[in-house]
Amino acid sequence: DGMETVKARQDYFKSLGGAMKALSGVAKNYDAEAAKAEAAKLEAILATDIKPLFAPGTSDADFPGESEAKASIWENMEDFGAKGQAMHEAGMELIAAANTGEASAFGPALKKLGGTCKACHDDYRAEH
């Protein structure tokens, strides 16, 4: 069912957003153990295969007011996939930075991950 897919996708991105918020909190008042713990949560989220969450027929055109995924995702799947891959790679870099215990590596890696979120949202997330 398309609406179930929309809800599952939203739940996934809410969990990712929650992780970003927690990681940002760690960056503001750096604590190596907290960074490692939050990075482990991020790693679990990033292990999810999100391809099924972007099934055709689940865009904002299909579910107005519910879905925030622009129909252009399915028209530009190669670019969308590349943006998703960039997010995943930046996330893994952040996890590696957190595991070093070095605050100096953590902040830039978090900023890079946030940039990948914005890049995709700017092109493919509908405003409601």
UniProtKB/Swiss-Prot annotation:
It comes from the Bacteria. It comes from Rhodopseudomonas sp. Binds 1 heme c group covalently per subunit. One of its GO terms (biological process) is electron transport chain. Cytochrome c' is the most widely occurring bacterial c-type cytochrome. Cytochromes c' are high-spin proteins and the heme has no sixth ligand. Their exact function is not known. Heme c binds at R9, K14, S67, E68, C117, C120, H121. Keywords: Electron transport, Heme, Iron, Metal-binding, Transport. Pfam families: Cytochrom_C_2. The keyword RNA-binding does not apply. GO terms for molecular function: electron transfer activity; heme binding; iron ion binding. Signal peptide: none annotated. This is Cytochrome c'. The keyword Metal-binding applies. One of its GO terms (cellular component) is periplasmic space.
